[in-house]
Amino acid sequence: MIVKASDQSVVVPLDRCEVACVDPERVAAVAERLPDERESQRLAESFRVLSDPGRVRLIVALLEGELCVCDLAAVTGLSETACSHNLRLLRSARLVRYRKQGRNVYYALDDAHIRLLLDVGLQHIGEDE
């Protein structure tokens, strides 16, 4: 939007309020529901870890149940080294857990919340099609 004041033109962005006005009650209600700094940091870290397509494929593969590193590498097309590295990152973010049986290491989703997060994400991107 362009506003003319005498001989000067002022450009006001369309994606901002033209007048600053704050609804204190609404702001207070929303602020109460915001996560604290630590929770925000942990949530952002979880999403950061999920920002890699290879790690997303690993998580989606684990929606089907527990798999060993060799199987995960085969199903995702990642090398076993890349697979292990990405699984270590997912484990440090508490998205997956592992157990060792003999000479094999098996991974699974850490809890049902991860399944829900992925299911909702997959539904969301499916809406575009």
Segments the model singles out, each with a brief description of its role:
Residues 108-129:
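Conserved segment of winged-helix/HTH DNA-binding domains
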Residues 91-101, 108:
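Beta-hairpin "wing" of winged helix-turn-helix
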Residues 87-88:
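Short, hydrophobic-biased segments on the C-terminal half of alpha helices
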Residues 33, 37-81, 105-112:
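N-terminal helix-turn-helix DNA-binding core of bacterial DNA-binding proteins
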